[in-house]
């Protein structure tokens, strides 16, 4: 996992970065009226994407996992957890576009990768996903939140992380794609061990 936001990422998509910089930690609909507007069928469809993503990662099917991301998709792990608003003005544990994600996948597949001898394995345990709001109000897509436990194991040692996923999903040619996956770790501000795979 990269130790800070990669400078090249910031120049790849100015519009996406501008939108991401406005992503603030907010709660699900603040009224019963907002909750009533949530479409259960839409919520299930989006939750299925999140569950599929976790299953592909657990199975080590990284190429298939990449196809779940939109062309301008991002993977973001804030250094400050849920309190962090901006991925550019403040360092992040990871802030990666499709190109950087693809490079990481290629490294994991490389039989000469020293950090993968023996290979890392992972397990995602998800709670029920919840659609935050019925409408796509910020242009990023529909936001879904999913509390999680993540276990990564390698050579007899395990790492346990917990937190909440925030996925923004958009419909592309009739298929739901991940525009942004934000991983808010519960203890993001403490020293973390090296994570080889994707949380």
Model-predicted regions and their roles:
Residues 150-160:
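Short, cysteine-centered beta-strand-loop-beta hairpins and adjacent loop/turn segments enriched
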Residues 47-48, 122-124, 160-162:
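Short solvent-exposed loop/turn micro-motifs enriched in small/polar/acidic residues
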Residues 2-12, 16-71:
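Short, low-complexity N-terminal intrinsically disordered segments enriched in polar/charged residues
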Residues 71-144:
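A solvent-exposed, acidic/Ser-Thr-rich amphipathic alpha-helical stretch
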Residues 53-55, 112-119, 155-156:
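Short helix-to-loop capping/linker segments positioned immediately adjacent to catalytic or ligand/cofactor-binding
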């Amino acid at each position: 996992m990269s130790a800070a936001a990669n400078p090249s990422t910031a120049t790849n998509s100015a519009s996406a970065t501008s939108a991401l910089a406005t992503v603030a930690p907010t709660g699900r609909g603040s009224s019963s009226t907002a909750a009533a507007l949530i479409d259960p069928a839409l919520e299930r469809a989006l939750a299925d994407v999140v569950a599929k993503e976790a299953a592909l990662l657990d199975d080590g099917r990284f190429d298939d996992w990449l196809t779940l991301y939109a062309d301008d998709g991002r993977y973001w792990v804030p250094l400050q957890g849920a309190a962090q608003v901006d991925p550019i003005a403040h360092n992040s544990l990871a802030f990666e576009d499709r190109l950087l994600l693809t490079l990481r996948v290629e490294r994991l597949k490389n039989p000469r990768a020293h950090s993968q001898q023996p290979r890392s394995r992972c397990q995602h345990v998800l709670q029920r996903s919840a659609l935050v709001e019925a409408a796509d109000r910020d242009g990023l897509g529909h936001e879904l939140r999913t509390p999680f436990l993540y276990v990564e194991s390698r050579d007899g040692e395990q790492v346990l992380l917990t937190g909440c996923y925030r996925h923004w999903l958009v419909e592309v040619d009739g298929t739901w794609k991940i525009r942004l996956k934000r991983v808010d770790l519960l203890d993001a501000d403490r020293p973390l061990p090296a994570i080889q795979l994707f949380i």
